[in-house]
Amino acid sequence: MSQKGIKSLTISIASPEQILSWSKGEITKPETINYKSLKPEPNGLFDESIFGPSKDYECYCGKYRKVKHKGKVCERCHVEITESIVRRERMGHIELAAPVAHIWFTKELPSPSKISLLLDITYKEVDQVVYFVNYIVLDEGNNEYDGKSIFNKKEVLDLTSPKNSIRSRNKLRRTLRNIQERIEEELNHEREALIQDFDYRLAVTYDQMLKDSNIPFSVKDVMAFIEKHTGVRFGIGAEAIHELLEKLNLEEEHEKIKQAIQNSPNAYDQKTKRLLRRLECVRWIKDSGSKPEWMVMTRIPVTPSETRPIISLDGGRFTTSDTNNFYRKIIIRNERLKQMQATDAPEILLDNEKRLLQEAVDSLFDNNSRKKPVVGKDKRPLKSLSNHLKGKQGLFRQNLLGKRVDYSGRSVIVVGPELKMYEVGIPALMILKLFRPYIISELIRKRDEFGNEIQPICANIKLAEQKILAQDDEIWPVVEKVIKQRPVILNRAPTLHRLGIQAFEPKMVDGKAIRLHPLVTTAFNADFDGDQMAVHIPLSKEAVAEARSILLASWHILGPKDGKPIITPTQDMILGIYYLTKEKFPQPIEEMILKDPVQARIEFINHFHIFATQDEAIRAYKLKTIRINDVIGITTKAFDNKSFSKEGILVTTVGKIIFNQAFPTNFPYINDVKNLYGDNQFEIIGMHESILDYLKAYNLKEPLTKKTLSTVIDYLYKVSEIEVVPQTMDKIKALGFKYSMISATSISAFDIPSYDQKYEYFKETDELVAKLREFYLDGKLTDDERYTKVVQAWSQTKDKVTHDIEKLINSDEYKDNPIVIMAKSGARGNTSNFTQLAGMRGLMSKSYNYDQKNNSGVIKDTIEIPIKHSFIEGLSVSEYFNSSFGARKGMTDTAMKTAKSGYMTRKLVDSTQAVVIKGNDCGTKEGIIVREIRNTKDNTSIESLKDRIVGRFSINPIYDTKNKLIIEGDKLITNEIANMIQNSGIREVEVRSPLHCSSLYGVCQKCFGLDLSTNKLIETGTAIGVIAAQSIGEPGTQLTMRTFHTGGVAGDTNITQGFERIKQLFDCIQPQENEKAIISQVKGTVDRIEKDSNTNGYNVVIKYNKDNFVSYPTRPNAVLRIKTGDNVVAGQKITEGSIDVNDLLKYAGIENVRHYIIKEVQKVYRMQGIEISDKYIEVIISQLTNKVTITNPGDSGLFVGETISINEFTEVAQSMLVNKKKPPSAINQVFGLDHAPSKSGSFLSAASFQDTKKILTDAAARSQKDMLIGLKENVILGNLIPAGTGLKDVEEVIAYGEEMYKKQY
């Protein structure tokens, strides 16, 4: 422990002495509380003398009842006078009458268990010994036959199963005959003497009994007899295991196993694998300082009584925690066993009782691992201690990582267009509840801010509470004052990324709904159809400062996943801005242009108004001299601080003048979408230029759409101070709402364009489908080929319809159509909606099990009969049925996808949560070579070179093709430089990457580069692991669940895409046989490609190393990616499909694996139009590929099969080389997301993810120390996380918060 909290945490196996040191007393009675007095029973499970008093400072008998007696122990009832909270931490213990094996060390999945590995006996044999089924040899004694010992130490004798017992019986009989022979020798084979000898007769009798398996006999007696004569000792139950573990010499065992591994001929057979696991286990226990016999318990701890309470229900009944039932059972059986031992009961009864005790303790620790778990009254298995740790409802996830918090509330959200960017409207009732303590403190305050005495509004707390309850008029000014003191934090579930939680300054509003600023809805993914949001209040000064400086909504301009503005206006606002920035010819010219375009342009000058100032132009609009969209002229001098390329008359509209007033005065004038902030000389009529000539050639400019507005905001963010952006956005929001109202855009069914051309296409396609059916019936086509061609034909028909409708809505006829305006501006709707409204609905998908084994090779997940009608025409009954079928499938898919995507995000976070920015520069000279990502199949660009290198650091100087320096090494590649590199024709660039950062923990600033959400160098302490996981997980729900056709002909592979493909890549799942690509294992040249008539596939023969050949047979209908004479490298695709990552690692190395995963992940996301920065994918991949497995330890002290991080391995190897010792060697490993978290090095973080029991067992066996490097382990222990403000001083955080607070407008 330190001032700042816990520094590290170690877990180990508890010794009996340690259990005793925790305990405050032994529990000997199974009673809990007295049914009359309801007080805890002495020596029972709730005994006050052991666990502490039930009431603060009051003993059991009532002799002492005040704080003044604190620390005394009552003479009568022996209860210490202290606070009752100690009942949450004080423990008791139970002295067991017989040793009991800990179930975690006997039953472990995946087996073998720790005890099984230490004693080198099978998992099943341990089980049989512990549960009193079979005996184990404790000492082989002096008992030989043919010069060999009959029994081996730790051999398990099976006398119960009819099949396996013959061998054990024969061994016992052999021993008995040995005894007979020995006695015969002693008595010189005299018959009389032998008959008289009791032991001889006994040996003969036992031999007869063992010969016939039907004769019952006492195993105990036989074994006691054998022990007396030969010294061979047998044992049963946990006692026997305890004795064997006690006598185990770990040093000897360690050396023995090591020798056996060295002598092993094959390093990969099962025997060697088991030896390696044994070596690992023995070394763990040896190095941990624990003793192996502690795995068998002689006493067990009793958890504090408050952690397993008894709760009284209505009607005088009680309910109790399941743990108490387990403890009761243990105590009853333990006490019964003690009594039996005291009365010398028969061995068979004692063994049975010991077995029952073993089972009782097992069910306490892990009830579900047993074949028949202990069940309650409702036949439900009771919750054991293991169940309390595991799963979503377990201790880790329910209580330690996520807690319910005070000072919070939730309500429905409605839109609040009148709010500023950083404000939220909170209902008055909510404020009274949430801010209650602060309001009361203000109401009873007796001094003002300057320390002067003042008359309080209320004399005491009670009166203040009454005033609040009555909602007295006097309290409202106080409430207004109080809510200015601290912001509130809003959260919308599901919180998929960090923008799901933001802070706002509260404003009191009427009603019961929270009013939310319309621009933050995108970040929260909120809409106003009944969504609810939770409100939290930061209490401490640090929390308030953090909320204002970091969490405040107005600082979240860019989305962290792609660095694009996330506060772009939507819907109504876009419609308003579109209307405002639209251009029209003056009204008379507009009418004339349809009849006589040439004359209209000449006449234009007579209606072209020129203004001297902005106010003059706006006044003319208000007086209705001109319309808001009419093209007008205004002198450039009317704009004081704006710079123009020349002086003259700017050709614009009143709408654009109003729009530009929202921006800072020095921001460029936005007039033309195509030329947002560059050279605007073509928009200005110069001093000596002809106005008539200019107007004759004038073409109307496009208005601003959602896309172009986003670019403007992006530019604004780049050139302005951070506090200017939210102010501007609020002005744009206000303009948007105002002018969407003025534009009076409405919608009606008659606005939808009419379109009849489709019936001709239908006629053609129907004829083609009929023809295909004939071909199928004649046997010219298979059913699969027919199906594929039909689906293809209808898809092409729909494409034609879509093309026609696009042409229609882009025509002049529909330019003022409200629905078209909505779609064009980006406010609502798209071409697909038009196609379905006016054209045809097209093909629908149907439910299909993608995992099924399919001989046809074609996935039939589309109904082949299309829906020909549009929604305006109305659907027929069968069309309506198919349509509903498809729509419902869409709904279920969405629900399934949300759950799967959420789980994937959780796995991603767990894998990367410890990755934090550490230090400025790790000094690495390695980087990754980055090229444009192209889809090699159709040669289209997936991600440009510019997108991949912007915001990163170069490794070496970069020169263009003329050898001119573009950028030096170790410098940041900005947007401008990235453009220069791309335009200069350079194909590849080496840049710094998180994949090669040599920081021991985390990543350095230079290997990461710019922070996408601020466009500045990433700050140290940023938790990029979590941000990366959220950036990849959050858009996961937008990915499809379908396995797409790659279209067209059968034989083209159906490759898993969308969400399933991402899962396949990150979890390292092998692709199915029918979609797996064959890759070359060697570097060489394609010698020949032969068609295989038997399999209908190909044989691809590759020549390598001058005259060696290797042949790759492909599956039927495989699509080849190479041709004869091509040069191939190891890891290159020979056929289409998905590569198995493990194969790629084997033949092409880890770098190729990393590049392949980046490329494939980007392919999936970008095909869906989702942009994610490469850097985030690299952070994830670095966590999946940063481990190596030791193949040869050298002199390092590591052992074969051990998995450690690359950076640790490098450090060990370097120190070995420096000291002239033999360094270790290792191979790279790729772990899927399921296994990566458990390899993190922190047992707390791993145990809170999955496999809690296994991870804690392993950690305890090796006395693992958790250095608390990641975020989760610190959250669990209640420390500040080692990231962000958790690394700064409190004063620094508060000062920064106050500074940012001043920037509010």
Curated annotation (Swiss-Prot):
Reaction equations catalysed: RNA(n) + a ribonucleoside 5'-triphosphate = RNA(n+1) + diphosphate
Function: DNA-dependent RNA polymerase catalyzes the transcription of DNA into RNA using the four ribonucleoside triphosphates as substrates.
Cofactor: binding comment: Binds 1 Mg(2+) ion per subunit. Binds 2 Zn(2+) ions per subunit.
UniProt name for this protein: DNA-directed RNA polymerase subunit beta'
A Gene Ontology BP annotation from the UniProt entry: DNA-templated transcription
Signal peptide: none
Pfam family, one: RNA_pol_Rpb1_1
Positions contributing to Zn(2+) 1 binding: C59, C61, C74, C77
Sequence similarity: Belongs to the RNA polymerase beta' chain family.
NCBIfam families: rpoC_TIGR
SUPFAM superfamilies documented for this protein: beta and beta-prime subunits of DNA dependent RNA-polymerase
Organism: Ureaplasma urealyticum serovar 10 (strain ATCC 33699 / Western)
Transmembrane stretches, start-end: none
